[in-house]
């Protein structure tokens, strides 16, 4: 953060309660009275109006004086008004605090400069809001508040903090404003994410709909069906036909003309007034080749890059709009190793109105980008920075294990700090935060991540541990010191994590979640809760931080011995506490809306259901399911694993072994599944370790597909530490995580796999009930790849 000038008073930048005043000092309040009124600019925005009210309320809380508008008052604190004597244009993101005579002016550049500067002023008084629940640090009461002559300019290190979140309640909006968070739509005009079929809709996805990762069209184009009227706008597939499953045909000049016309339609429809704003041109969220047509491939050769046609399209759009809209910047993402992760190698400089956002989704999520293991992911960001005026950085603040997504038992604070500082050194001046870094859930250390990001966006060099202490003192009160030690231990574990931690691992593969560690941490939380007894606010904050731990205990329960389980005080106690925390959290999030009982009830239920989508299957598994068929009784050790369906919950089905199932489409093909392993440093990182197993219609014809659950033996194979039995043919990113069963002391041990499936007689649906895995007392040949040991064997247990 750059600061030019200071509050000209002795103690720091503001003096509160001074016993004597200099001639140039401004006495804001004395003895509970003030001559000052806080005045907003004419026609303030909602955020500016709310910030001015915050300023009045906070000054009154500190001094006891009323800073409301009163015609008898002769002195003013103006919000959003630039004094006539200040002729210097504001830089991007700059905020200024200036005194002219007895008046004070707070003003800034950009959509939220005038409200952000209010919180610069309040922060210098010692005011911090640290989370959406209202926890804060405020100075002691000051009957006399004096400041010196003011002349200060602040340019935040990273002016724009935005992400995958919008506020649904007033107190969430309040927190966003106080921390300087931009709502998702604040910075963008019309389009903020993947834009291909949103701007050039195929007609296959209705307005408001979504298929996979592709959303339906903007409202301006909801009646368009370009795949019918202009199929040439879409990529040519590998087999010579146009398809909506790849990207747009970005080399097509008619497509470019239509795209440009549609951008103009959006700008007009959104009443774009020429202010600083961004428009996303990001391609659709499909991996692989963009287009197989000869013109696109010619541009790939020209740019020496697989995204050559797309880059050429981007640069064309920049040329078309540069002069007419000088403050409009086009955004795109450096995303996916086989697409835009790396810049075009011969490009010397990006257009002035082009900004790329770097998305390091494939890096090791237990280490920062500055760690040697992530060198291959750090270099593309550095290469983009060399040709860019500025960058956007996508923040993935935590791992996203399936199916719990944003709630893993991790710290991921220091890694976040290191990544932000590395991105800043490489010209990142905007950050886009993915799940787990927005003020919409408060479990684990999510709120700390949000606050840390906000503080570092203001001042990238601010001390990390000071921020942690400031946050924890406010949130956990007497338990702050113990919470800091808990965080430090998790940080130490992550720093020494032995495996490459991908972005979406199986939660059960996280090695630090041993029964001994889980028990010790649970007992630590018991002690912390005893320290805050009598403070409902501190207790709720502790329970939120404890939720990730409780969830992991439930997930690991079937893998503990009975002796270990007995030490936790009962499974149902852990389940009740975890589920109770979800409800208490949701009610806190939507507090203040109880006057709309149906809305409040629906929102609370929806939030709880979203969080429980991953938890419920671990609860079901921990409680135990229906008995297995008698054929399994002869085995001493049997592991039962429920399916996961990406980040979605499972379907309820009383006939399923655990009452839950993954319902998907019938694939109507020969092969349904394969064992996939994640291998760091290999392209592609995911590889199939065995040929697809023959579980298609040919096999099912031997047994009647009667819609009932049946157990099919797949065969025996060894596994590796990060492996998944993949059923993506049934539903995207679905299957069974099996890597947690790997034993490094016996790496070639064979496991027998049996899958429980119900198949619709009419071949419309398939239901996955569970996977049964049996460790065998024999090994595969040393060095052998994971694979079937018996040719084409699929047995059926009725």
Report each predicted region and the residues it spans:
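Acidic, contiguous N-terminal accessory segments
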Residues: 20-96, 136-151
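Substrate-binding cleft/loops of secretory-pathway carbohydrate-active enzymes
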Residues: 334-361, 405-412, 440-449
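Bacterial N-terminal signal peptides
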Residues: 7-16
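Structured mid-domain segments that build the active-site/substrate or prosthetic-cofactor binding neighborhood
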Residues: 254-255, 265, 375-481, 485, ...
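Feature activates predominantly on carbohydrate-active enzymes
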Residues: 34, 51-54, 58, 92-315, ...
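Catalytic domains of carbohydrate-active enzymes that cleave complex glycans
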Residues: 427, 453-692, 703-704, 710-712
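Extracellular carbohydrate recognition and processing domains
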Residues: 686, 690-742
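Exposed low-complexity, polar/acidic, P/S/T/G-rich flexible segments that act as propeptides
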Residues: 733-798
């Amino acid at each position: 953060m750059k600061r030019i000038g200071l509050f000209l008073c002795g103690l720091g930048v503001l003096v509160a309660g001074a016993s004597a005043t200099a001639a140039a000092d401004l006495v804001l309040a004395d003895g509970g009275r003030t001559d000052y009124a806080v005045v907003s600019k004419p026609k303030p925005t909602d955020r500016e109006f709310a910030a001015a009210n915050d300023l009045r309320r906070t000054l009154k809380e500190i001094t006891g004086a009323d800073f409301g508008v009163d015609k008898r008052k002769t002195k003013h604190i103006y919000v959003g008004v630039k004094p006539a004597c200040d002729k210097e244009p504001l830089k991007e993101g700059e905020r200024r605090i200036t005194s002219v005579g007895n008046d004070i002016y707070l003003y800034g550049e950009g959509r939220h400069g005038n409200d952000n500067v209010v919180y610069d002023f309040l922060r210098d008084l010692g005011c911090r809001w640290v989370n959406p629940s209202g926890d804060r640090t405020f100075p002691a009461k000051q009957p006399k508040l004096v400041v010196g002559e003011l002349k200060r300019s602040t340019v935040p290190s990273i002016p724009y903090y935005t992400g995958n979140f919008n506020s649904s309640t007033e107190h969430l909006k309040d927190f966003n404003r106080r921390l300087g968070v931009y709502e998702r739509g604040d910075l963008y005009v019309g389009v903020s994410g993947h834009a291909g079929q949103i701007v050039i809709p195929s007609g296959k996805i209705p307005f408001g709909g979504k298929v996979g990762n592709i959303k339906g069209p903007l409202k301006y184009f909801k009646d368009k069906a370009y795949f019918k009227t202009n199929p040439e706008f879409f990529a040519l597939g590998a087999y010579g036909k146009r398809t909506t499953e790849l990207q747009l045909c970005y080399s097509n000049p008619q497509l470019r003309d239509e795209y440009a016309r549609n951008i103009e339609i959006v700008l007009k429809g959104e009443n774009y007034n020429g202010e600083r704003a961004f428009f996303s041109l990001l391609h659709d969220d499909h991996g692989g080749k963009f287009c197989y047509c000869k013109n696109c491939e010619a541009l790939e050769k020209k740019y020496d890059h697989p995204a050559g046609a797309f880059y050429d399209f981007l640069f064309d759009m920049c040329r078309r709009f540069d002069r007419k809209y000088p403050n409009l910047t086009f955004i795109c993402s450096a995303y996916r190793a086989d697409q835009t992760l790396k810049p075009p190698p011969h490009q010397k400089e990006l257009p002035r109105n082009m900004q790329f956002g770097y998305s390091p989704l494939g890096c090791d999520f237990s280490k920062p980008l500055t760690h040697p293991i992530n060198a291959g992911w750090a270099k593309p960001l550095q290469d983009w920075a060399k040709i860019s005026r500025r960058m956007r950085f996508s923040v993935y603040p935590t791992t996203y294990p399936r199916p719990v997504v944003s709630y893993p038992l991790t710290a991921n604070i220091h890694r976040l700090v290191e990544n932000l500082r590395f991105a800043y050194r490489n010209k990142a001046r905007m950050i886009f935060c993915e799940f787990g870094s927005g003020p919409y859930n408060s479990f684990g250390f999510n709120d700390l991540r949000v606050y840390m990001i906000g503080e570092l966006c203001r001042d990238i060099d601010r001390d990390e541990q000071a921020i942690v202490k400031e946050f924890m003192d406010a949130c956990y009160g007497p338990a702050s010191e113990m919470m800091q030690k808990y965080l430090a231990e998790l940080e130490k574990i992550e720093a020494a994590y032995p495996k490459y931690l991908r972005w979406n691992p199986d939660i059960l593969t996280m090695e630090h979640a041993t029964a001994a560690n889980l028990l010790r941490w649970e007992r630590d939380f018991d002690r912390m809760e005893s320290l805050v007894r009598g403070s409902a606010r501190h207790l709720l904050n502790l329970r939120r931080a404890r939720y990730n731990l409780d969830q992991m205990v439930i997930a690991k329960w079937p893998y503990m011995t009975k002796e270990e389980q007995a030490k936790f005080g009962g499974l149902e106690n852990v389940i009740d506490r975890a589920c109770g925390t979800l409800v208490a959290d949701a009610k806190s999030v939507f507090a203040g809306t109880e006057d709309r009982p149906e809305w409040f009830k629906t929102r609370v239920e929806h939030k709880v259901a979203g969080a429980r989508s991953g938890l419920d299957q671990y609860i079901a598994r921990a409680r135990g399911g229906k008995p297995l068929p008698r054929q399994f009784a002869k085995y001493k050790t049997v592991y039962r694993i429920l399916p996961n369906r990406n980040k979605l919950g499972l379907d309820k089905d009383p006939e399923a072994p655990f009452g839950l199932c993954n319902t998907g489409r019938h694939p109507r093909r020969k092969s349904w599944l394969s064992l996939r392993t994640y291998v760091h440093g290999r392209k592609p990182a995911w590889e199939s370790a065995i040929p697809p197993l023959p579980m298609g219609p040919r096999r099912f014809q031997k047994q009647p597909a009667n819609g009932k659950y049946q157990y099919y033996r797949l065969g025996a194979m060894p596994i590796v530490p990060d492996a998944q039995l993949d059923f993506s043919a049934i539903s995207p990113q679905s299957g069974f995580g099996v890597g947690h069963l790997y034993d490094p002391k016996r790496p070639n041990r064979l496991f027998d796999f049996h899958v429980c499936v119900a198949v619709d007689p009419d071949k419309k649906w398939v239901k996955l009930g569970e996977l049964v895995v049996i460790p065998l007392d024999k090994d595969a040949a040393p060095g052998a790849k994971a694979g079937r040991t018996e040719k084409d064997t699929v047995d059926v247990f009725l």
